[in-house]
Regions:
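Accessory interaction regions appended to the cores of large information-processing enzymes
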Residues: 1-175
Length: 175
């Protein structure tokens, strides 16, 4: 799908189960658009504990290759220790790259410089299994990017609207 068609589209995705589960929010943008400026702003404005990175892969830092479309990853929670930081930027970083590349391989989005992907990522501080975390990040990102690009199934949207008075959330215990 061309960058012009996806600018400003959002989605979320979840992969796996706690504590190694990964939750992401995704924003797709077109280079040069107002939404693209938001992605660039997120990338160029780090703060203590929150370091935006450009998704890159390779066996070592000297051989990094940028994932296309360019993908900015921002952590939603500050790393609590070196282990958590390695999981966020290593295992999740590889999973994000794989998930984006899965959606490119399916033909859903283009691997170009005009499409931009912003991934806001959450990982439980108790996570510990890097292989599982990587797989869960891949699942979450692939689902979110695909949903952002093509939208939700109309029947699923209608189901939510019909159930609007009884929808639940795991962090809400009320009626």
């Amino acid at each position: 799908m061309a960058a012009e068609d996806i600018d400003g589209r959002f989605a979320q995705g979840w992969g796996g189960a706690a504590p190694n589960g990964v939750h992401v929010n995704v924003l797709l943008a077109r280079r040069g658009s107002a939404t693209g400026a938001v992605v660039a702003g997120a990338f160029t404005n780090p703060s203590a504990g929150f370091t935006p990175v450009l998704a890159s892969v390779g066996p070592d830092q000297q051989s990094y290759e940028t994932v296309h479309p360019p993908t900015v990853v921002v952590n939603k929670i500050a790393p609590v220790d070196e282990r958590h930081e390695k999981l966020i930027f290593g295992a999740c970083g590889a999973g994000v790259a794989r998930g984006v590349l899965d959606v490119v391989a399916s033909g859903t989005i283009d691997a170009d410089q005009d499409t931009l992907v912003l991934v806001s990522l959450w990982l439980d501080t108790a996570a510990e299994d890097e292989t599982t975390v990587c797989a869960n990040a891949r699942t979450a990102v692939a689902a979110a990017v695909a949903e952002a690009a093509v939208g939700r199934d109309r029947a699923a949207v209608e189901r939510l609207v019909a159930a609007r008075d009884t929808v639940r959330h795991p962090f809400y215990d009320g009626a």
